[in-house]
Curated annotation (Swiss-Prot):
Protein's name in the database: Peptide chain release factor 3
Compartments (UniProt record): Cytoplasm
Superkingdom to which the source organism belongs: Bacteria
Naturally occurring in which organism (per UniProt): Salinibacter ruber (strain DSM 13855 / M31)
Record-level GO BP terms: regulation of translational termination
């Protein structure tokens, strides 16, 4: 094995941050970038009102509304490691893009608000992590505000997410009595001060919790800390690296991202124990990152990162081997050879050319409509990486143009936005009006805004009676009969796949009973199959 390749792989950490909206994910992201030297000033949440936007929020609508609705990729060094941070949408209506991004991550940092504990979106995201046994470290945020008792938060994680918890730091008070944390992993006392916003908080090594220095520093809270630490150590589990790496146990840290407290404590441990790039599954076998041949998989398409050029960028995770500028790779769905001369790396919306990349790295290649989510690339063996599916939309609207002469622009815009997978556009087998499908209502607003902003298309949406969607498959003869009898309810999505839109759950159930040889699928895999011309 090439020792350089081995070294490059083992110092990489490719991870995502997940949270419920407003738990502090964007703030934590910026503090990590600050620690890695990737940025020199954190765009704090309050600064949005002063028109300074968060580093990872770059779309116009995100800037205006102060939410993250797309996923960004940020690469930065930290303590000799090479970090690839996949920043995911925090808004509840953008979970599907998050699902796909999680397939490109080897581990996850989960951010919880100490006042709320585990919330609904966190549960949904955990379903995807559980599918892949993704290792998770938990950061309980906003300890400088009043919230739930720490033991209640641990119990909530264990009961709701079915994860064993092992606290590696323990808070001393909360709200206006928050004095800091005790690092159970390194036996250090970290003292909190609102004045130390740069994260350089005082650390005191403590060999023995009976050390009188604790009483001098913490006063009456010293005995509370001793009691809590004794309880946690006697009743709780010890850190089990194999259980963590298998997605069964989550190390837990407490802190305040806004005050930059506890972030370094958590992140130092994260880079030490988080896994390097892992094998990636394909239809035929698992691909080891240590294999010599280059392989990669497209897990995301983003249209109009540069609105001036209406570009489409494919985000490709390097799965094995070494990427080199100008190398020729086979695009296995089409069978065509591509020369990758202009691959890029990312820092939110900023990109720069990349000469080399290793497993775990994310590179961007211009797709020009040729690359789809789930497409596989390699220099040799034809492989098809398995991907997280699209999920059947739960909300539907009909698109109406304000100017009918812009129909071609509408079609182009919906096609490109659909390729991102954030919105799903369905065109009826009979008729011309597009039906939009989304997993959350806010996606419709985003689609209208982006059509206007990026494609100069003014449109409005009207309600439709559809309640649910299923992708259709089955024997050719049965499909032909099914189409003939259900023409008014059948559509093609942007990928050309046949979908059945039902007026109610009851109607769907009846149709499924009447057509037992037809498959009605609530998900659609993005594993790309060959379509050679």
């Amino acid at each position: 094995m090439d020792p350089v390749l081995k070294d490059e792989i083992e110092k990489r950490r490719t991870f995502a941050i997940i949270s419920h909206p407003d738990a502090g994910k964007t703030t934590l992201t910026e503090k990590l970038l600050l620690k890695g030297g990737a940025i020199h000033e954190a765009g704090e949440i309050k600064a949005r009102k002063a028109d300074r936007f968060a580093m990872s929020d770059w779309m116009t609508m995100e800037k205006e509304r102060g939410i993250s609705v797309t996923s960004s990729v940020m690469k930065f060094p930290y303590r000799g490691y090479e970090l690839n941070l996949l920043d995911t949408p925090g808004h509840r209506d953008f979970s599907e893009d998050t699902y796909r991004v999680l397939t490109a991550a080897d581990s996850v940092i989960m951010v919880l608000d100490n006042a709320s504990g585990v919330e609904q979106q966190t549960e949904k995201l955990m379903e995807v992590c559980r599918m892949q046994d993704t290792p998770i470290i938990t950061f309980v945020n906003k300890m400088d505000r009043h919230g739930l008792p720490p033991l209640d938060i641990l119990e909530d994680i264990e009961d709701t997410l079915d994860l064993d918890t092992v606290p590696l730091s323990w808070p001393i008070g909360m709200g206006n009595r928050f004095r800091g944390t005790y690092n159970l992993y390194r036996d250090e006392l970290h003292l909190f001060s609102h004045a130390d916003m740069d994260g350089e908080h005082e650390r005191l090594p403590i060999d023995d919790l009976d050390d009188p220095q604790l009483d001098e520093v913490l006063g009456d809270q010293a005995d509370d800390l001793r009691f809590d630490v004794e309880l946690v150590r006697e009743a709780g589990d010890e850190l089990d690296l194999q259980a963590y790496l298998g997605g069964k146990q989550t190390p837990v840290f407490f802190g305040s991202a806004l005050s930059n407290f506890g972030v370094g404590d958590m992140f130092d441990t994260f880079v030490e124990i988080a896994p390097p790039p892992q094998p990636r599954p394909t239809v035929t076998r698992d691909v080891s990152p240590y294999e010599d041949d280059f392989t990669g998989v497209a897990f995301k398409i983003q249209a109009n990162m540069d609105p001036k050029h209406h570009d489409r960028m494919a985000f490709v995770r390097v799965c094995s081997g070494k990427f080199e500028k100008g190398m020729e790779v086979i695009h296995h769905r089409t069978g065509q050879t591509m020369r990758l001369n202009n691959a890029t790396t990312f820092m939110a919306q900023d990109r720069e050319g990349v000469d080399t990349a290793y497993p775990g790295d994310i590179i961007g290649i211009m797709s020009h409509g040729r690359v789809k989510i789930g497409d596989s690339f390699s220099t040799a063996e034809p492989l098809h990486f398995t991907g997280v599916p699209s999920f059947a939309p739960e909300h539907f609207r009909k698109v109406r143009l304000d100017d009918p002469f812009r129909s071609k622009h509408l079609s182009k815009g919906l096609q490109q936005l659909s390729e991102e997978g954030t919105i799903q556009a369905f065109r009826p087998l009979r008729g011309n009006d597009y039906i939009l499908g989304a997993v959350g209502e806010l996606q419709f607003d985003v689609t209208l805004d982006r059509l206007e902003d990026e494609y100069n298309v003014d449109a409005h949406l009207t309600g439709v009676r559809y309640a649910c969607c299923r992708w259709i498959d089955g024997p050719a003869e049965d499909l032909e009969d099914f189409e003939a009898e259900n023409m008014d309810s059948l559509f093609r999505d942007a990928g050309g796949d046949l979908a059945y839109l039902a007026l109610s759950d009851f109607r769907l159930e009846r149709t499924m009973e009447n057509w037992p040889r037809i498959s009605f699928n609530s998900t659609k895999q993005h594993t790309a199959e060959e379509e050679r011309s």
